Amino acid sequence: MKIRVSVARQTLSLLADDGQLLREYSVSTAAAGVGEVPGSYRTPRGRHLIRAKIGAGQPENAVFVRRRPTGEIWTPELAAAHPGRDWILTRILWLSGCEPGFNRGFSPQGDCDTMRRYIYIHGSPDSAEMGRPGSHGCIRMRNADLIELFAQVPCYTPVEISED
């Protein structure tokens, strides 16, 4: 199995090993576009893999901070009480770059490591718009879609993030 993320189409495709499309999901990548620099709030490009799966067994809309469940469940009322919070919900697929000097380790411009940038595929509030850029660098998904995807992909599943 492998995953392909299209930034232009704002989709995440789950593919069989032979390339057959198994499922396609609407997602939201970075509002600031693509890039590999820490602090840029951009979605990194290139070859990645799922390094860690976090949140198995957590309820839908479980809130995560620093990859740990807070015990909170997202509601519109909780969101109103924390207006600037970047909501990471339900499950986390933590990505690691596979291309040294591009999205892993260091480049001539400095650190470019996707994992050290804490780039995830994660759940979002149902009010978050999918199908157009809006994240701070991560790949946002609908919670129900992420629960489905999480159950199908093991750690080390390849993830290709492309601009097309």
Question: Predicted segment positions?
Answer:
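Exported/periplasmic cell-wall-interacting domains
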Residues: Q58-D164
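Soluble periplasmic/extracytoplasmic beta-strand elements of cell-envelope proteins
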Residues: R4, S13, L49, I92-W94, ...
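Short, surface-exposed secondary-structure junctions/capping segments
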Residues: V34-K53
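A structural motif detector for short, solvent-exposed N-terminal "entry" segments of globular domains
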Residues: M1-G33
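Extracytoplasmic
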Residues: V7-R9, L22, R45, I88-T90, ...
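N-terminal post-signal-peptidase region of extra-cytosolic proteins
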Residues: M1, S26-S40, E72-A79
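Well-ordered beta-strand positions in beta-sheet-rich domains
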Residues: E24-S26, R47, Y118, P158
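Short, solvent-exposed loop/turn elements at domain surfaces
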Residues: L14, G35-E36, Q58-N61
